[in-house]
Amino acid sequence: GDIIRYTPGVNTSQGEGHRDAVVFRGVRSTADFFQDGARDDVQYYRSLYNIEQVEILRGPNALLFGRGGTGGALNRVTKKPRLGVDSRKASIGVDTFGAFDIEADLNMDMGDDMAFRLNLHSDSLKNHRDFYDGDRLGFNPTLRTKLSSATTLDLSYEYIDHERFIDRGIPTANNKPVEEFAEIVFGDKDNNVHTVEASVFRAMVSHVFSETRKGNLSITSNSFEKMYQNTYAASH
């Protein structure tokens, strides 16, 4: 949210309670997402627990790589193991509605040419809206090894398990939200459901040719199982 909020020309839009939806320079997209440069266009909410930085490109995608939308693209760069470093970090967050979030980031040095990193998170979703709840789990182990002084291999696996209540918001009248219904959900608590389970394998070989040139080869294998159903009020 904050990443997009403070990026000029980029806004969020309604993702119908189950997916990221970004507006690049007035063009709405649910598919122009990338992870480590590889396309990630499955419709779901992406977590940032294992993300080092987010890159946002604005302008026609065809100018860069041929396929995609006309407004721009969003690329998430994942955290990689750091050679020669041992570190551990954990955080816990709670709010007044009873929601909580737990994250951990472990980096382990395994010798001069190898390191291992594990990122994991678990959160429980709650807010002021009727029936709203959800649970999300994710973990991402990554192994890095130096094949030579200029070549590095990263092997990564990520597992995602996400279930949440679908809240499509409140109805409108005269092109405005009906504020009196701020806490009321116009839906079916047993029918408004979204689930996604995913396994993502990634392999990346990076090579430094010179001080000004480097290249990488990435291979990704993804398996997603998603279910989405809901009822909602269109108007009042």
Segments from the language model and where they lie:
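Glycine-rich, histidine-containing beta strand-loop boundary motifs that form or position
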Residues: 16, 35, 58, 120, ...
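Structured loops at beta-to-helix junctions and adjacent beta-edge loops in soluble globular domains
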Residues: 25-27, 79, 93, 158, ...
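Outer-membrane beta-barrel translocator/receptor signature
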Residues: 49-52, 63-141, 147-153
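Residue-level marker for the onset of beta-strands and adjacent loop->beta junctions
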Residues: 18-20, 29, 102, 127, ...
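Acidic/polar loop-and-plug regions of large Gram-negative outer-membrane beta-barrel proteins
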Residues: 123, 127, 140-208, 212-236
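Acidic, small-polar-rich N-terminal luminal/periplasmic segments of exported/outer-membrane proteins
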Residues: 1-85
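Short intrinsically disordered, low-complexity coil segments enriched in acidic
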Residues: 1-7, 119, 192-193, 236
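Residue-level recognition of beta-strand termini and adjacent short loop/turns
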Residues: 4, 16, 111, 146-148, ...
